Design a protein with these regions (language model features):
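Conserved RNP beta-strands of RNA recognition motif
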Residues: 43
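Catalytic core of pol beta-like nucleotidyltransferases
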Residues: 1-26, 32-38, 46-94
Length: 94
């Protein structure tokens, strides 16, 4: 996994700040592969409170703090997209 311990803590803190402590977070995509370089931070979040405003604020907060592009996918009620299963199956739970 190509994130430092402090970056991982920052991500979990910010996501929990915006979505609550019950939010579950997965890192997926190129940052999971230690052999790759660069790339954005792909995050998948499951929460009981998937509000669009919280999603936007969280994304901006993470991008400013990490100085990296963040792709944030938040599961919404009734949604079941393939990317959600991929993120959970191939990703790393933070």
């Amino acid at each position: 996994m190509r994130l430092t311990a402090s970056q991982t803590r920052l991500i979990t803190d910010r996501v929990h700040q915006h979505f609550g402590a019950q939010a579950k977070i997965w890192l997926f995509g190129s940052r999971v592969d230690d052999c790759k370089r660069g790339g954005d931070v792909d995050l998948y979040v499951e929460t009981d409170h998937p509000e669009l405003l919280s999603e936007l604020r969280c994304k901006i907060s993470l991008e400013e703090a990490l100085d990296l592009h963040v792709d944030l996918i938040v599961k919404k009620a009734g949604q079941n997209h393939p990317i959600q299963q991929i993120a959970k199956a191939e990703g790393v739970r933070l």
